[in-house]
């Protein structure tokens, strides 16, 4: 019985990671991030308030795939970009993954935008260590729409936004662990690229990141 369970988990993780590998190329993640930011800004009633974007110290954008039945596997990739004195930094590759319990039949793809509201949050990502949402840093579902424009100071270090199958929903990411993908950074920049060096602006963003920087520069 134990062998069957082990084989099931292995197969489950394999299928989830196989889907994740579709997004393994960092340029794909960068291009996808552009589309995600645009989608999260389309409808005023469900959009991330411009004020939240303007005050953001950094922005993380992820595409996460969940697959399985009873036991579910989750894997996702994306990028995080920090605000500098001269604009926005280049992107740093990130990823997440794990197992969960509960009814999860088939495959579900979700998009997430995480707003980093504090310098402490940026520093946590800059160190290149694993970041646990709601653990290392307080996280809350972010405000949406025009009514949130008048919001005062952020209520958490991180604001999270999610979109699944075309529907915007407030989904807590508490407990999610996000890790730096060092190999993807090195391949994208053509040399070892530590998150802190990317966020400081010391490493020039590749030309492929320009469209993402242009979209974010509106805020």
Predicted regions and their residues:
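Bacterial N-terminal signal peptides that target proteins for export
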Residues: 1-8
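Small-residue-enriched, tightly packed secondary-structure blocks
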Residues: 23-219
């Amino acid at each position: 019985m134990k062998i069957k369970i082990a084989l099931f988990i292995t197969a489950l993780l394999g299928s989830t990671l196989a889907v994740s590998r579709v997004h393994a190329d960092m340029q794909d993640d960068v291009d996808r991030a552009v589309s995600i930011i645009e989608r999260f800004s389309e409808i005023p009633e469900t959009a991330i308030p411009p004020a939240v974007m303007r005050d953001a110290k950094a922005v993380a954008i992820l595409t996460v795939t969940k697959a399985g039945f009873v036991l579910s596997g989750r894997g996702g990739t994306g990028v995080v970009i920090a605000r500098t004195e001269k604009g926005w930094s280049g992107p740093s590759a990130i990823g997440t993954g794990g197992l969960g319990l509960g009814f999860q039949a088939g495959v579900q793809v979700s998009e997430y935008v995480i707003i980093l509201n504090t310098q402490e949050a940026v520093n946590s990502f800059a160190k290149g260590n694993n970041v646990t949402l709601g653990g290392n840093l307080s996280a809350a579902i972010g405000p949406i729409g025009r009514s949130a424009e008048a919001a005062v100071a952020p209520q958490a270090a991180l604001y999270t936004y999610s979109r699944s199958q075309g529907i915007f929903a407030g989904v807590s990411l508490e407990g999610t662990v996000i890790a730096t993908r060092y190999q993807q950074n090195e391949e994208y920049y053509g040399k070892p690229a530590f998150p802190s060096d990317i966020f400081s602006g010391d490493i020039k963003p590749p030309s492929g990141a320009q469209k993402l920087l242009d979209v974010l520069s509106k805020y």
